[in-house]
């Protein structure tokens, strides 16, 4: 994708990725539609698509706007479809439907001028043979849908999770709770920071808010890498919920700790900051490079090991072990709204089996008298509470830790002794990622 002029945000590219004829199009809209198509048709994840050379070639401001358009559209697909349905005799191809969805969301949801958006999307539709026959439909349907839904948008039902996820969550939590989660997903996620020093001081410097657990939540995100303290490594981005597993270990200086599935390194940095002797384990050498970069920026130290905990050839045991197991990541939808569209629920059974194996392997690394924290960023009980129950029934030398981590609310505790965190918690503060966390102590 050619780099657009930085003063206009427009370029002569086509939706198909090559110029068919010289059209002046809004590059962010073109790129956002490509992303939506990749997610909806090929089940690609947003994190994958923003690593392409086409996306990286965009100017920084266009990359930011592209992601804003794509993520906002993904959060409001249901609302957009409700607005469009009365004006469509039948659903068009998804590539056409995504142009319509983006148009409705940008005009009604983001407040962009209808005339400019519709005209540009008609031009985008005309730029490739696949969608060109639908330019008249795009023009007519968008104008009608935008006019009809204006003033009703905020009253429209929020985006529902797909059945493969919604059904088990409704069974576990009830429909009211699931609807509260969906509302939290629609609102998106602020940026949370874990800071290396006084949270209040950094909250003031960054115009943020100190959360009950000590994280700093930014009120105005902007470009993260240009904020004070980033280059100096004084803080790192980490959702508040994701900071609890490491802090619950309550590490002391000099203690040994193993961080299993360590990338991208937020928990490793928390542990290193405590003065513990940290060994970070991850199966991916590429992801471990990210951990090394983060440690270098923050001037913290850890021993990085690329290996699978299931067959790691090392007989050491540790004072503490943290396993953040690979999972469905369904607790992160508020910041990754592509997940309900990019995933279809397949593979979760295999993940659950892997999690059980990894939990048993991690437990073998805990010294007598040590402690183990197990967590997943999943909303599905089979990836959290069920594992804890099964493990505690089988491993009689481990018992649930009854302490309450800083900022955690007692009512979040689940029956087996862990904590079930949900995206609708702290709603007045902006929510949190969904997580399951349990600490278990090994007998001496």
Residue ranges and their predicted role:
Residues 1-444:
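S-adenosylmethionine
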């Amino acid at each position: 994708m050619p780099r657009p002029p930085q003063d206009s945000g427009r370029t002569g590219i086509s939706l198909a990725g090559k110029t068919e004829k010289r059209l002046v199009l809004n590059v962010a809209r073109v790129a956002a539609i490509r992303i939506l198509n990749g997610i909806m048709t090929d089940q690609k994840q947003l994190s994958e698509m923003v690593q392409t050379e086409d996306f990286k070639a965009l100017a920084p401001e266009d990359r930011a706007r592209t992601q804003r358009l794509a993520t906002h559209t993904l959060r409001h697909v249901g609302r957009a479809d409700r607005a469009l349905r009365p004006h469509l005799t039948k659903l068009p191809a998804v590539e056409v439907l995504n142009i319509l969805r983006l148009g409705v969301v940008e005009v009604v949801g983001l407040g962009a001028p209808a005339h400019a958006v519709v005209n540009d999307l008609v031009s985008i539709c005309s730029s490739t043979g696949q969608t060109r026959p639908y330019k008249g439909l795009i023009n007519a349907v968008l104008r009608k849908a935008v006019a009809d839904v204006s003033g009703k948008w905020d009253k429209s039902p929020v985006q529902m999770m797909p059945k493969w996820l919604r059904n088990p969550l409704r069974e576990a939590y009830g429909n009211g709770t699931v609807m509260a989660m969906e509302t939290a997903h629609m609102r998106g996620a602020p940026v949370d920071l874990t800071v290396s020093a006084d949270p209040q001081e950094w909250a003031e410097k960054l115009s943020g808010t100190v959360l009950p657990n000590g994280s700093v939540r930014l009120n105005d995100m902007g470009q993260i890498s240009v904020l004070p303290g980033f280059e100096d490594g004084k803080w790192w981005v980490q959702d508040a919920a994701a900071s609890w597993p490491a802090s619950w270990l309550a590490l002391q200086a000099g203690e040994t700790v193993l961080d299993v599935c360590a990338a991208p390194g937020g928990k490793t940095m928390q542990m290193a900051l405590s003065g513990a002797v940290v060994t970070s384990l991850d199966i991916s050498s590429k992801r471990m490079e990210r951990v090394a970069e983060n440690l270098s920026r923050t001037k913290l130290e850890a021993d990085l090991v690329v290996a699978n905990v299931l067959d790691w050839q090392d007989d050491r045991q540790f004072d503490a072990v943290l396993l953040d197991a690979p999972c469905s990541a369904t607790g992160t939808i508020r910041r990754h709204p592509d997940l309900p569209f990019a995933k279809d629920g397949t593979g979760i059974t295999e993940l659950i089996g892997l999690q059980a194996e990894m939990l048993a392997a991690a437990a073998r690394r805990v010294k007598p008298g040590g402690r183990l924290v197990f967590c997943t960023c999943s909303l599905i009980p089979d990836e959290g509470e069920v594992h804890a129950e099964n493990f505690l029934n089988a491993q009689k030398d481990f018992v649930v830790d009854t302490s309450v981590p800083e900022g955690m609310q007692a009512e979040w505790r689940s029956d087996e002794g862990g904590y079930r965190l949900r995206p609708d918690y702290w709603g007045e503060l902006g929510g949190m990622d969904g997580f399951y966390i349990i600490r278990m102590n090994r007998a001496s």
